[in-house]
Every structure is written in structure tokens, then in C-alpha cells.
């Protein structure tokens, strides 16, 4: 957990399509854009530029081993120390990291958003608030289907195949169990306004302690 004078870290976890981004937006609205640094865990998938494209297509993106945990910890620690970072960007059409990065400045609050945000013990130890966004599996699948076809150039068939072969079983094995680490569980996903209001009130109190 962060100490006096250091940024306050919030972990926002939950299944794919559960509403994590909506929760993160509420944090930004609560604290103010310039006061929040956001680390999207999707950008910390391992670089696969040394692997043939056809082989990349078979990557299990829903397994913890797909992530570069060391880099994520390193960059989170840099933000906690007040040092700007160059966050990698992941190209989901090429299934590897993009050549460019995004500069992220330190803020009073750091949000780590991703379905494995609460998976790593070292990352959890840096968090002042751990949130799990819960949503019905059917709702999550529909949201994922729309996102991947509209934003990531995927075909509906490939999204369905990935969901049945990887996403669902990996969620049950690795994501759902991290719910027990959460300080706050938001049922009904990002559409739960009363829960989001309560979360916002809690964040205001905790973020102002320093």
C-alpha cells in the first residue's frame, strides 16, 4: 500500500467486458483528469515481434503468462516514485507491441485496470483500494464481441472461437478467483450507478488523506 506523500493506487479488475473502463472513467471524474495516471494492463502483453505472425494468432491472451509482469511492476513503481513512464501500446491487429509508446505522467491516483489487475501479489501489495467489477457472463461476452469486431478488426467467428476456447475457461480458472482479494465488488458491472457513487465517495476520502 502507498505511504504518506506517495500516489494512491487503485486496482480495477473483472472479466472481459465487465465494465472496468466505466469504473476507471468514474475515478477520473472523481479525482480530475490531471490527477490520475492510468495503466491499462492490455498494453503489457509480452512483445511478440520475434515470433512469426501465424504463431502469434495462437497466443492465449487470457492466461497470466501472456503478460510482462516485470515491466508492469517496474513502471508502476516509477509512477509511485514520481517518475514519468513510456507505457507500451499493444497492436491487437498485429498481435504484438506497437513501435510507439504513450507517455504517462505521475498523478495523485494511479489506476491499474485489467482483468488480471488483482492477480499478482506484488502489485496487490502496492494498492490502497482493490475493486472487482462483476457482470453477467452473457453481458460480458456481448460487450467483448462488439469491442473486438468494431475496434480490433476481428471477425465474429474468431471472437466466438476465442471466447469458448480461451476466455471463458481462463476467466473461471484465473480471473474469478481474484474476486476474493477485492475490497469492493461492484455487481452488475459499470451500469451500477449507486455502487459507482459509493465508490466515488470512498475514493474522495482516501485520495485526500495525503
UniProtKB/Swiss-Prot annotation:
Keywords, sorted A to Z: ATP-binding, Cytoplasm, Kinase, Nucleotide-binding, Transferase
InterPro entries assigned: P-loop_NTPase, PRK/URK, Uridine_kinase, Uridine_kinase-like
Pathway noted in the entry: Pyrimidine metabolism; CTP biosynthesis via salvage pathway; CTP from cytidine: step 1/3; Pyrimidine metabolism; UMP biosynthesis via salvage pathway; UMP from uridine: step 1/1
CDD domains, per database record: UMPK
GO cellular component terms given for this protein: cytoplasm
EC number: 2.7.1.48
Binding site for ATP: 14-21
Catalytically driven reaction(s): uridine + ATP = UMP + ADP + H(+); cytidine + ATP = CMP + ADP + H(+)
GO biological process assignments: CTP salvage; UMP salvage
Compartments, record wording: Cytoplasm
Molecular function, one GO term: cytidine kinase activity
Broad class of where this protein is predominantly found: cytoplasm
Family label: Belongs to the uridine kinase family.
Protein name as annotated: Uridine kinase
Lineage: Bacteria, Thermotogati, Deinococcota, Deinococci, Deinococcales
Gene symbol of the encoding locus: udk
Amino acid at each position: 500500500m502507498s505511504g504518506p506523500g506517495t500516489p494512491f493506487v487503485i486496482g480495477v479488475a473483472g472479466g472481459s467486458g465487465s465494465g472496468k473502463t466505466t469504473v476507471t472513467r468514474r475515478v477520473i471524474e472523481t479525482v480530475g483528469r490531471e490527477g490520475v495516471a492510468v495503466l491499462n494492463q492490455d498494453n503489457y502483453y509480452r512483445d511478440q515481434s520475434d515470433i512469426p505472425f501465424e504463431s502469434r494468432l495462437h497466443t492465449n491472451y487470457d492466461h497470466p503468462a501472456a503478460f510482462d509482469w516485470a515491466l508492469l511492476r517496474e513502471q508502476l513503481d516509477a509512477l509511485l516514485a514520481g517518475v514519468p513512464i513510456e507505457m507500451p501500446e499493444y497492436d491487437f491487429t498485429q498481435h504484438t507491441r506497437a513501435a510507439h509508446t504513450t507517455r504517462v505522467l505521475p498523478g495523485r491516483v494511479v489506476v491499474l485496470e485489467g482483468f488480471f489487475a488483482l492477480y499478482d501479489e506484488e502489485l496487490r501489495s502496492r494498492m490502497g483500494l482493490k475493486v472487482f467489477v462483476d457482470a453477467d457472463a452473457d453481458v460480458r461476452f456481448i460487450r467483448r464481441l462488439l469491442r473486438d469486431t468494431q475496434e480490433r478488426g476481428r471477425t465474429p467467428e474468431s471472437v466466438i472461437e476465442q471466447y469458448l476456447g480461451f476466455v471463458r475457461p481462463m476467466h473461471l480458472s484465473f480471473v474469478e478467483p481474484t474476486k476474493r482479494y477485492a475490497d469492493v465488488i461492484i455487481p452488475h458491472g459499470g451500469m451500477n450507478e449507486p455502487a459507482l457513487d459509493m465508490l466515488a465517495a470512498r475514493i474522495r476520502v482516501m485520495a485526500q488523506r495525503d
